[in-house]
Amino acid sequence: MISVIIPTFNEEENIAQCLVSLSHQSLPRSEYEIIVVDGGSKDATCEIAQKYADLVFTQTSKKVGGARNDGVMAAKGEIIATTDADCILPPHWLKKIAEDFLDPSVVQVYGPVYPIEEGIGNQFSLFLANMFSRIGYYSKTFFYTLGCNTAFRKNAFIRAGMYRCIDAGDDLEIAMRMKDTGAILFDNGLKVGFSMRRYEKFGAVQSIYEWIAIVSDGGESGKYSYSRKDYK
């Protein structure tokens, strides 16, 4: 079984389209579960999620990494897939993940993203992000495993120490520990629709700058707005 984990916080405007896309996967519904881990939403996020998800509960650990960790510990599946509440998953997303893990040496897979919103600027921003992912993977210097489009073996993830509860870079950091447990695979066909709302609100350059600054400082945000929960 594959367990899909989605952290949420005040996502009533986005969570339905994400969960609908997950409900229309080519993988049989009996072969995966949907887990929504909420960060204390004040809107109708949980009510909407309960219409589609197998399990909805409030996180007890801190930050997005902690929410994913909580989801992993509640998961029934031996394979864990993670995405974000504002993403759209193509119909064959879970089937691709299942196929990638037929190789017993693989402990984690990840793939590229494409913008949900239109615009040349959005396309260019994610072109650069995907290029960054490929450079890291093929050079074997780092693995830019975005939390919106990655999957891993539960046992290997737990052995690696799980996500750090930091503001940014937890998905990049965990991969450096996961590689010590087995092979990490970048699958060009494992694509996810990614919302550009953060970039459109704060600006692409500012968002990227803040992400780099936070990661360089060990993952703690402090003065930066990049990882705050109160943006819509």
Where would I find each of the regions flagged by the language model?
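Glycine-rich, basic loop-to-helix element that forms the pyrophosphate-binding segment
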Residues: Q59-A75
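A recurrent flexible, glycine/aromatic-enriched loop bordering the glycosyltransferase active site
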Residues: P115-N122, S133-F152
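Acidic donor-binding loop at a coil-to-helix junction in glycosyltransferase catalytic cores
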Residues: D167-I174
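Short aromatic/hydrophobic "clamp" motif used to bind/position activated sugar donors
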Residues: I80
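Short, well-formed alpha-helical segments that are part of the catalytic scaffolds
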Residues: E11-Q25
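A conserved acidic beta->alpha catalytic loop
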Residues: S21, D38-C46, C87
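Conserved donor NDP-sugar-binding/catalytic core segment of glycosyltransferases
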Residues: H92-G121
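Cell-envelope/extracellular polymer assembly enzymes that use nucleotide-activated donors
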Residues: M1-S3, E33, E173
